[in-house]
C-alpha cells in the first residue's frame, strides 16, 4: 500500500496519478494504513468526528472488492446517519467553518474558490447539514453526490425550488472554475489569480464574453461574486439559532410518543428550525 501511494506521487511522473491524503485515515498519521472492518467500526463509533461523517457521505468504492466496500458502507451507515435529530453536528459544522474563516483572515481569504465566503465548502456544508440532521430517519437523503443531494432536498421541500436552482448553478460554476484554475496553472490551488491577464485567460476557458482583457476579467469576477454572495447568504440563513434547535430537540422526544405529538411537533417546533423553509410539508413528505 505504501509503495503504491509513493508511486502515485513520484516526481518522475509528468502528472499526479491520484492525490491521496493518508492523514484522513482512522487515527491520522498515528493509525494503520490498512484497517480491518472491526477496527474501523470501533474507531468511528468510539472516536469518529463530524468532519469524518461528512467525508463518508461521499465515500465510494474506487478499486478492489465491491462486496467488501458494500460491507464497509453498511457497517458505517449508523455512524454517519443518527436516528435522532443531530443538532450537535450542525453546531460542529458551524464551528468548522468559523475556524476555516479565522485561518483565512488576512491570508488568501479573497478569491478562495473552495474555502472562502460563498465557496464550494459552504455549498457542501449546507447540503451535508441537512443530510446529517435528517438522514437518520429519511434514507432518501443518503445521497453521495452533491447535485443529487440538492435535488432530493428540493423534492422533499427542504430546499425551495428557487434556492435549489441558484445553489446548483453556483456549485457547477465554482467546480468548473476550480478545475480550470488547477488545469491552467498545473497546481492544486483554489485561489483565483490576482492579475487581470490570468483572470482573462480563465474567463475565456469559462466561456465568458468580453471584447478586451479587462472586460473578460471583470465579467468573470462579476459572475463569481454574484454566485458567492448567494451561497454565503444562504449558508448563514440556513442555520437556526442554538436556542431554537434546543427547543426542537426537547420536543422531539415527545413527538415520538403519539400521532398527536407528531402534529404538534410539525406545526410548532419544526417552524423554529430555519433549515426547513416549509416544515409542515417537509415533515409529511
What are these model-predicted stretches?
Residues 7-285:
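A nucleotide- and high-energy phosphate-metabolite-utilizing enzyme signature
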Residues 1-6:
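Short, exposed "boundary/linker" segments that immediately precede the start
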